[in-house]
Amino acid sequence: MLIIGERINGMFGDIKRAIQERDPAPVQEWARRQEEGGARALDLNVGPAVQDKVSAMEWLVEVTQEVSNLTLCLDSTNIKAIEAGLKKCKNRAMINSTNAEREKVEKLFPLAVEHGAALIGLTMNKTGIPKDSDTRLAFAMELVAAADEFGLPMEDLYIDPLILPANVAQDHAPEVLKTLQQIKMLADPAPKTVLGLSNVSQNCQNRPLINRTFLAMAMACGLDAAIADACDEALIETAATAEILLNQTVYCDSFVKMFKTR
């Protein structure tokens, strides 16, 4: 299970201020904390309030790399910002994200191939997020076909079946789990899968409990990666334990510590 730390995001007040003031301290503190917590990649999102998203993304990449060698997941709807961030990355990166719209596919798949980056593909188009598994899977098939068309290795494609909050779209969760299982049958080798895990508990009570419960369920259905709160100790313990019980890693008495430090 690849944990992608979610916290360096301009939607959070401290990161928003850090970007506005070009203060690296909060960004670097969260990079360190998430890596110590068990993250093996860091999502970087400048947030919606920033006017110059290109320079903001460049800055985020630079200051994060000063303290961390983890994979950086460049999270933006602004393709120019993603491209600028990729050029600043010292190590292999991940693009977050494209949907199945042809216009975006034709730009972001070649960009990922050019930079040797992994790419997150969303199972949706401009009409929105599907309610059922069959429609999600149809979009996943389009993304798999695009990877083949543009030469993106299948193991570098991370398909996100898009979970919504349990308090407003409770019926989506079983459909997402079903989609996770089916995605693994679309190609050989199969594409990877990823979820924005915290979305499942947005505006809910007991968010950490919902997050870690759904993580274990999703892992049992084949989930490979999650953009999540890497500083939630119980969440990381759940991920480490699920790997053992799914026979994905060999048991040792210090399995949680091993998960965090591998």
From Swiss-Prot:
Functional description taken from the UniProt entry: Methyltransferase that mediates the transfer of a N5-methyl group of (6S)-methyltetrahydrofolate to the 5-methoxybenzimidazolylcobamide cofactor of a corrinoid/Fe-S protein (AcsC/AcsD) in the anaerobic acetyl-CoA pathway (Wood-Ljungdahl pathway) of carbon monoxide and carbon dioxide fixation.
Pfam families recorded: Pterin_bind
Protein name: 5-methyltetrahydrofolate:corrinoid/iron-sulfur protein co-methyltransferase
Keywords: Calcium, Carbon dioxide fixation, Cobalamin, Cobalt, Metal-binding, Methyltransferase, Transferase
GO biological process: carbon fixation; homocysteine metabolic process; methylation; tetrahydrofolate metabolic process
Binding site for Ca(2+) 1: 184, 222, 224
E.C. numbers: 2.1.1.258
Naturally occurring in which organism (per UniProt): Moorella thermoacetica
Summary of subunit composition and partner proteins: Heterohexamer composed of 2 subunits of AcsC, 2 subunits of AcsD and 2 subunits of AcsE.
Cellular component per GO, a single term: cytosol
Positions marked as site (Transition state stabilizer): 199
NCBIfam families: PRK07535.1 (NF005719)
Designated gene of the protein: acsE
SUPFAM superfamilies xref list: Dihydropteroate synthetase-like
Disulfide bonding pattern of the chain: none
Residue numbers binding methylcob(III)alamin: 202-203
Keyword Ligase: no
